[in-house]
């Protein structure tokens, strides 16, 4: 899956190349690829490269099937599609690989600001995957999901590119649930002024 992730990162950064590649794929493959390119491209356009690597603390994620069970439990309890929750976790911390707080002070695998966690975290531990996923579902539900996912996601992170990216990855998983396992294996990359740097995965 690492090679696919690398390809999507290249295509997300080059609209012309992406159009050529997508035009040569079959309909089904093109639809999946377009979702990934659109989602990655939105984030690429919004976030600038960094000059220095952030001091990330990283760890292996919980097993994929365990996370999937947590997503399903949250969907059953709050009515928020598991694919949306998985897409949020993918973007926020690469399925829990990043354990550092964000520059804004957001914490845990679903990246909650402490005040938001106090309101929607259900008394759980923001650093525990199950608690964080349930808290995210609770917050998205209170913010308008599932009837208005875009609005709910904008409450979660008020960046249009973020909403576009979450929606793109979630839609791809809705069409093909097995894509969750591909996304689960995506690694942590940092875009720097000198190029991409991979922080997790094979050989590291």
Regions found by a protein language model. Give the residues of each.
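Alpha-helical segment that forms one wall of the substrate-binding/catalytic cleft
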Residues: 65-77, 83, 109, 114-170
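Cell-wall glycan-active module
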Residues: 1-73, 160, 168-204
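Surface-exposed patches in mature extracellular/periplasmic domains of secreted proteins
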Residues: 16-20, 79-87, 100, 145-156, ...
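Glycine- and small hydrophobic-enriched segments that form the cores of compact globular domains
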Residues: 48-103, 121
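Solvent-exposed loop/turn segments at secondary-structure junctions
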Residues: 91-96, 116-118, 158-162, 172-173, ...
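Amphipathic alpha-helical interaction surfaces
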Residues: 7-10, 14, 77, 91-94, ...
């Amino acid at each position: 899956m690492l090679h696919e992730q690398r390809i999507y990162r290249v295509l997300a950064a080059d609209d012309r190349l992406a159009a050529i590649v997508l035009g040569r794929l079959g309909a089904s493959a093109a639809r999946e690829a377009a979702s990934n390119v659109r989602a990655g491209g939105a984030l690429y356009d919004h976030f600038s490269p960094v000059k220095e690597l952030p001091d990330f603390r990283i760890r292996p994620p919980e097993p994929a099937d365990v996370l999937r069970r947590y997503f399903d439990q949250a969907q059953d309890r709050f009515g928020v599609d598991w694919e949306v929750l998985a897409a949020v976790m993918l973007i926020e911390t690469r399925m829990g690989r990043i354990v550092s707080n964000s520059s804004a002070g957001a914490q845990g695998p679903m990246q909650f600001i402490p005040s938001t966690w106090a309101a929607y975290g259900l008394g759980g531990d923001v650093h525990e995957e199950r608690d964080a996923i349930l808290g995210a579902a609770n917050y998205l539900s209170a913010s308008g999901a599932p009837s208005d996912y875009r609005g709910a996601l904008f409450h979660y992170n008020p960046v249009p590119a973020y909403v576009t990216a979450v929606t793109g990855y979630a839609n791809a998983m809705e069409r093909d649930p097995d894509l969750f396992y591909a996304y689960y294996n995506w690694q942590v990359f940092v875009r720097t002024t000198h190029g991409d740097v991979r922080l997790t995965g094979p050989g590291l």
